[in-house]
Amino acid sequence: MAQHKLEALTRNVVGKKRAVRRLRKQGLIPGVVYGPDIEPLSISIKKSNLIKLLYEVTEASIISLSVKDETGNEVFSHDVFIKNIQYDKLTDEVKHIDFYAPEKGHTMNINIPLEFIGKPKGVEKGGIVEIIHHELPVETLPSVIVEKLEIDISNLDLGESFHVSDLKLPTGMTAELPENEPLVTIAIPRGIEVEETTSEEEVEPEVIEKGKKEEE
């Protein structure tokens, strides 16, 4: 997994709109860090650094966060995850960001992006890839989190799906969707007929019954 680093400063003024606006004019974005074993810590981050980071990470990316005080001393260092981002409704700029610092050895809930790779057999026959879930909600230990899950769908034929039960998740990670939930399917467009194979078992009873009628 790629290593992502971010530096921040402690923020003493909390909840005052004027102070927050002053921060933003200085090119800083307010934020907070919290977790099960730490006190919430108000921080500010250089806007350019945060925007660059947001282009590189997902919700499942581990970020090494270092927070310093006014004198430049490091007062907090922890691996964190992005928990929530507030955007301005008019400008779509980041207004505030929440980071979650997980407790070591304890599980957390997170959404992991899914990346479907390979050209399915069904697509070569005219089928269409329909992605049902772009992310997988999981309960997981922080130590086994991955930035994305790659799923090979090259063997999927017309009308076939890749289900949660087909995933091979690392030990310590559990999907929070039913096992029979499809993640992606190869849809059959109108006008394309799928050949149905008839098994010997299905044909045999008809032959036997025909023999009985002839005996009668």
Curated annotation (Swiss-Prot):
Basic and acidic residues bias (residue ranges): 207-216
Gene field: rplY
Ranges in coiled-coil conformation: none
One Gene Ontology cellular component annotation held by this UniProt entry: cytosolic large ribosomal subunit
Function: This is one of the proteins that binds to the 5S RNA in the ribosome where it forms part of the central protuberance.
Entries under InterPro entries matching the protein: Rbsml_bL25/Gln-tRNA_synth_N, Ribosomal_bL25/Gln-tRNA_synth, Ribosomal_bL25_b-dom, Ribosomal_bL25_C, Ribosomal_bL25_long, Ribosomal_L25_dom, Ribosomal_uL5_bac-type
Disulphide bridges: none
Family the UniProt entry places it in: Belongs to the bacterial ribosomal protein bL25 family. CTC subfamily.
PANTHER family xref list: RIBOSOMAL PROTEIN L25/GLN-TRNA SYNTHETASE, ANTI-CODON-BINDING DOMAIN-CONTAINING PROTEIN, RIBOSOMAL PROTEIN L25_GLN-TRNA SYNTHETASE, ANTI-CODON-BINDING DOMAIN-CONTAINING PROTEIN
Organism, as annotated: Thermosipho melanesiensis (strain DSM 12029 / CIP 104789 / BI429)
UniProt protein name: Large ribosomal subunit protein bL25
Pfam family, one: Ribosomal_TL5_C
Gene3D superfamilies: Ribosomal protein L25, beta domain, Ribosomal Protein L25, Chain P
GO BP field: translation
